[in-house]
């Protein structure tokens, strides 16, 4: 084998090893986004919920700042229960539809049903809860104790 071929092979192996350490992206995040859009009839973009209060977005701690933030805490807790059942909620794909009455789930497995129900409950909660701009992108180190 030529030295150049060995270098290419080595580079491919190293890049594959590095890629294996990258955690997978949440696959159902897109589905959750669509459920939110369906529930609130497009009145607020889904990304507005990604960094809201103490629980909407990555992580979560302290006391929820308002009703909308409580929706996110309940959603986090629901995912925690799904994990206890042996499900992987951030990776679980499910079937859902956006009907005239809003979103609904149509899934087959227990994990799909449970995770879709978690997302559906949160999406409907978001739709009925007031959005307070002052709770977007807050300093969680100070307000979420």
Curated annotation (Swiss-Prot):
One of its GO terms (molecular function) is phospholipid binding. It is found in: Secreted. One of its GO terms (biological process) is phospholipid metabolic process. Ca(2+) binds at residues 55, 57, 59, 76. It catalyses: a 1,2-diacyl-sn-glycero-3-phosphocholine + H2O = a 1-acyl-sn-glycero-3-phosphocholine + a fatty acid + H(+). Its EC number is 3.1.1.4. Residues 1-21 form the signal peptide. InterPro entries: PLipase_A2 (IPR001211), PLipase_A2_Asp_AS (IPR033112), PLipase_A2_dom (IPR016090), PLipase_A2_dom_sf (IPR036444), PLipase_A2_His_AS (IPR033113). The active site is at residues 75, 119. It comes from the Eukaryota. PLA2 catalyzes the calcium-dependent hydrolysis of the 2-acyl groups in 3-sn-phosphoglycerides. PANTHER family: PHOSPHOLIPASE A2, PHOSPHOLIPASE A2 FAMILY MEMBER. This is Basic phospholipase A2 cL038.
